[in-house]
UniProtKB/Swiss-Prot annotation:
Name this protein carries in UniProt: Calreticulin
Primary localization: endoplasmic reticulum
Functional description taken from the UniProt entry: Molecular calcium-binding chaperone promoting folding, oligomeric assembly and quality control in the ER via the calreticulin/calnexin cycle. This lectin may interact transiently with almost all of the monoglucosylated glycoproteins that are synthesized in the ER.
Localization: Endoplasmic reticulum lumen
Taxon lineage: Eukaryota, Metazoa, Chordata, Craniata, Vertebrata
GO molecular-function terms, A-Z: carbohydrate binding; metal ion binding
GO cellular component terms, semicolon-separated: endoplasmic reticulum lumen
SS bonds (residue pairs): none
Residues spanning the signal sequence: none
UniProt keywords, alphabetically: Calcium, Chaperone, Endoplasmic reticulum, Lectin, Metal-binding, Zinc
Originating species: Pelophylax lessonae (Pool frog)
Sequence similarity: Belongs to the calreticulin family.
Amino acid sequence: DPLVFFKXXFXXG
């Protein structure tokens, strides 16, 4: 899912 990557990677990263 693109949303998971965006939230996980952007928020978490």
